[in-house]
Amino acid sequence: FDDFWICDGTGGAPCNDFLGFGHFVQSLVPSSTGDDSDWDVTPGPDHYAAVDELEQDDTEYVESITIGDLDLYHYDSPPALGGIKGLQVHTEARITGTIERTLKTVIKHNYTTESEDAGQMVGNSNYLTFTRLMPLNPVTGVAWVRDDIDNLQAGVKVG
């Protein structure tokens, strides 16, 4: 894959100007189960192992229809190669029954949990990819630093 980003001059820093040369996108996958594991896991028992693939394969997954259920995951630290311009979380989801639900991306930094206000509607049996871009740490409101990523948990919540 190529690393690319587009800054269109709108919004807040750092996404409103040229970011400079020498940056790259680092993909991280869950490395262990986080503080919350409310969702059902197949085949089990480790929640993170069911979602640590870069592409879904329908043999391992977590699922829930219960509003408020939260599943969090720890991630390994990225390589120390310069500043962090943002964090982007990708989630692939679909419904397996007939009940539509809203899916929210959740970030836990230290002891504070933050989720999207509205979330995204999951109402299709085909996989949909939901992306949440966070140029700033939504818990602190300032630019990401390495310590933020080292102590980060990210996951999903039924809205």
State where each predicted segment sits.
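Disulfide-rich extracellular domains of secreted proteins
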Residues: 1-159
